[in-house]
Amino acid sequence: MAIAERASATTNGAAQMTKPKVVVIGGWGRFGDVGEKDILERAGCDVVVLESREEKDILAAVKDADGLIAPPVLTKTLISALDKCKVIACSSIGMDKVDGVELANEKGIVICNVPDVFIDEVANHTLALLLACVRWIVPVAQHTKEGGWGQRGGRRPVGYIHRITGETIGLIGFGNISRQVAKRAQGFDLKVMAYDPYVPAEAFRAAGVRQAQLAQVLQDSDFVSVHVPLLPGTHHLIGRSQLALMKKDAILLNTARGPVVDEPALIEALQNGQILGAGLDVTEHEPVDPNNPLLQMPNVVVTPHMASASDWAGAERRRRPAYEVAAVLTGHRPRAVWNPSVLEKVSLK
């Protein structure tokens, strides 16, 4: 049965039973705009939208909640306050700000995220950053708006321009987004290599991607693109020693999480000409400091953590948590479970 059908399926006696309570934290006047409230109500849920961001108000509202739709900032304090919650759904891929997973497991709470909603958007943005860096789109556009045209007027607005055909892009991580980046890169006749110790060799072969160790990817690639979640083991995965392995004309791309890259080391590498440039949708501290040296460098493109944005994805990221909560509260397994070990403690079809 499809997830939408499962979510709307209720028993004949549901009306006589106490409706499960679903609390939505942070509706900010918009919850229900894309049908997410209807999804929950069709599943027999009573929906409470909490506009307050005050912790005392949140803790009071969620105490008797059966389900929760929340930002991906799940603290032990919040999870401790849940007396009978069965499911928490968040509208993000990354869950690096969740510190109450073990407690949720103990309490039998399923935590859901949306790992497959933004795949195409982030992959497309990665290629957009690559092309913007290679073609020097931002400084050239600005040069033109200021009255320049090409190299006339005595000012050269750009450095040399790569011809990307036949060059190599190296992917750090080979999950869903990275595989779509590989597919798109191959469309530009780029060679693709990737590092991911958790992915079987067959997945690389099937995608026509050369599997390699991290050091080899860094050494051999003209473009290095980061696609790993932020975990204790990936914090500053790309640091000073890794940047030192890269080619002097290489470009670093990051559409994953800012702290995966040691930002001071990256700034140093760019200032010293150790690498050619960078395309970043994320920074180590967000929002980015207006005085951050990265923002002053013509060989760096920075966008405001918006790689996942599109009209479709924006609506789907709001509907999906509702479907996931509805699925669990009607006894069905959700599509994406962040803490899969909890499934051993709960009974879901």
Regions found by a protein language model. Give the residues of each.
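Phosphate-binding beta-alpha-beta segment of Rossmann-like dinucleotide-binding domains, i.e.
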Residues: 109, 114-168, 334
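Hydrophobic Val/Ile/Leu positions in short beta-strands of Rossmann-like dinucleotide-binding domains
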Residues: 24, 169-171
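An N-terminal-biased, well-structured beta-alpha scaffold segment characteristic
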Residues: 2-7, 11-112, 239, 349
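Rossmann-like dinucleotide-binding domain for NAD(H)/NADP(H)
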Residues: 111-112, 240, 249-349
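Short beta->alpha connector loops at strand-helix junctions that form conserved
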Residues: 51, 91-92, 109-120, 196, ...
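Rossmann-like adenosine-cofactor binding region
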Residues: 63, 80, 193, 197-293
